[in-house]
Design a protein with these regions (language model features):
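Vicinal oxygen chelate
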Residues: 2, 85-135, 172-173, 218-257
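Conserved active-site tyrosine of GNAT-family acetyltransferases
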Residues: 22-27, 84, 114, 152, ...
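Internal, well-ordered alpha-helical scaffold/interface segments
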Residues: 150, 154, 158, 191-194, ...
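Core segments of cupin and vicinal oxygen chelate
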Residues: 4-51, 98-99, 105, 144-182, ...
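N-terminal beta-strand motif that seeds the catalytic metal site of vicinal oxygen chelate
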Residues: 1-20, 64-69, 122-150, 163, ...
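A cross-kingdom feature marking solvent-exposed beta-strand/loop segments within repeated
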Residues: 38-41, 50-105, 127-128, 179-183, ...
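Helix N-cap motif at beta-to-alpha junctions
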Residues: 18-19, 72-76, 202-205, 241
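Conserved short beta-strand elements that form part of the metal-binding/catalytic scaffold
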Residues: 32-65, 115-123, 165-194, 199-203, ...
Length: 257
């Protein structure tokens, strides 16, 4: 059975110029809950045990500030630091106590394309919440635009221990557990965030959630449909700051034992 040093996608940090509107949207419409507000930032949880899945930070423009993954063991930090450097990344802060509300130990690196990646171990877990008919459980994946898909995929494979699951003409799908993909890398003229996907309990939850979004004045940007790679159901929307976000469910599970 494959061992992954990185075991899951946990959260994203988003800068937004409309943080009050964004908080209302993600809590009243999208189905997340506030965990804590702290100095211009809002931490939002889903129904799963992750301390938060989105951290909103007041800023002058919409931007992806960081992606946080969880590592299997504190012993994995040292090896990741070496392979990140070997593959063109940079360790910005070595493993140390996390001053954020999620606690634990965190290491921060910059990938070859400039994005910040955080790796957490021993971070705070919360008691799961009842799964409502339209509420996300956790993050499913992030989709990143890249000027060099193959180079980006290679970094995730060789530096971070992900495995390539699928490769289409324009996208690479890499995973760090049995989910078909945790990161998608899409061919684009500039590097950056394409979208963030939230896992829903099932197809019915995607449909119910989509209905709530439409009723609240947020039309479906694309969907409801089913992707080829990953076989997952999808519905895409645009949040108040312009970020593309996705409800998804029924993600293909990969068994390579």
């Amino acid at each position: 059975m494959t061992r992954f040093p990185v075991t899951s996608l946990r959260s994203v940090d988003l800068g937004t110029p409309v943080i009050d509107r964004a908080e209302r949207f993600y809590t009243s419409v999208w189905g997340l809950e506030v965990v804590i507000r702290d100095q211009g930032s809002v931490y939002l949880r889903a129904t799963g045990s992750d301390h938060h899945v989105v951290a909103l930070h007041a800023g002058v423009r919409p931007e992806l500030r960081a992606i946080t993954f969880r590592v299997d063991s504190a012993d994995d930090f040292a090896a990741l630091g070496v392979t990140v450097a070997e593959q063109g990344g940079q360790v910005l802060s070595p493993p140390g106590a996390n001053a954020g509300p999620d606690g634990g130990t965190v290491m921060t690196v910059r990938g070859p394309e400039g994005g910040l990646l955080r790796f957490a171990h021993g971070d705070r877990q919360l008691a799961p919440l009842p799964q409502g008919g339209y509420r996300p459980v956790r993050l499913a994946h992030v989709n990143l635009n890249s000027i060099d898909v193959d180079a980006s995929a290679t970094f995730y494979e060789k530096a971070l221990g992900f495995r390539l699951t699928d490769r289409s003409k324009a996208m690479a799908f890499v995973r760090c557990n049995t989910d078909h993909h945790a990161v998608v890398i899409a061919d684009a003229p500039v590097n950056g965030l394409n979208h963030v996907a939230f896992l829903m309990p099932d197809l019915e939850a995607v449909m119910r959630g989509a209905g709530r979004l439409i009723d609240a004045g947020f039309p479906i940007a694309w969907g409801v449909g089913r992707h080829g790679p990953g076989d997952n159901v999808f519905a895409y929307f645009i949040d108040p700051a312009g970020f593309v976000i996705e409800y998804t469910a029924e993600v293909l599970q990969v068994d390579d034992s």
